[in-house]
Regions:
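Transmembrane helix-loop junction
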Residues: 83, 114-115, 161
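Transmembrane alpha-helix boundary and packing residues in multipass membrane permease domains
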Residues: 79, 107-111, 157
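Membrane-interface transmembrane helices that cradle and orient dolichyl/undecaprenyl
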Residues: 155-161
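Extended basic-aromatic, gly/pro-enriched interface segments that bind polyanionic ligands
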Residues: 152
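Membrane-interface starts of transmembrane alpha-helices
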Residues: 4, 85-94, 119-126
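Membrane-interface coil-to-helix junctions
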Residues: 16-105, 130-149
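Transmembrane-helix signature of polytopic, membrane-embedded enzymes
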Residues: 110-132
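Start-transfer (signal-anchor) and selected internal transmembrane alpha helices
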Residues: 1-22
Length: 161
């Protein structure tokens, strides 16, 4: 990897983090409707049970099976890591995980385009367009449908190699 590639990937990794930090100074990065009412409150309840895979949740929907809530991230990586740190609020993990995935998408897009043989300027501009896309604007509203993009670029890199 060239020195210029490392510089571009570093810029692509830092830009989303700076955006989240700028937004977070005045409010929380995330939607109060989707994040707070669903993902944060349910992930916090999952942690309060102190079980990795409980059979059921006694206080939710009349003792419903735990896998009924898999849509809300029962076994998401950020929720699993948050089990190790019960004193840290869950919204820090969810914001950090969303930011990490958003940041890594730009770098993975750049690497995929580099493997395809595009010029440096085209790779960098395309990766900037990727991290500024509308779906990442929505990442502060909904987290479930945007988290797949870095894994998409990673799979494209692996398929091409």
């Amino acid at each position: 990897m060239k020195k210029r590639d490392t510089f571009y990937i570093t810029i692509l990794f830092i830009l989303p983090i700076l955006f989240v930090l700028c937004v977070s100074t005045y409010s929380m990065y995330g939607s109060k409707l989707d994040w707070l009412s669903q993902h944060i409150s349910l992930a916090d309840y999952f942690r309060q049970t102190q079980q990795l895979l409980p059979d059921s949740f006694e206080n939710l929907q009349g003792q419903t099976n735990a896998f009924s809530f898999s849509y809300y991230g029962l076994l998401r990586p950020d929720v699993l890591v948050s089990y190790l740190f019960p004193n840290i609020p869950i919204h820090f993990f969810i914001i950090g995980y969303a930011t990490l995935l958003w940041s890594s998408t730009g770098g993975l897009c750049y690497c995929w385009l580099r493997n395809k043989g595009y010029k440096d300027s085209i790779r960098f501009f395309s990766s900037i367009c990727c991290i500024c896309a509308n779906c990442f604007f929505q990442s502060h509203q909904q987290i479930m449908f945007v988290e797949i993009l870095p894994f998409l670029f990673l799979s494209l890199i692996l398929i091409d190699s």
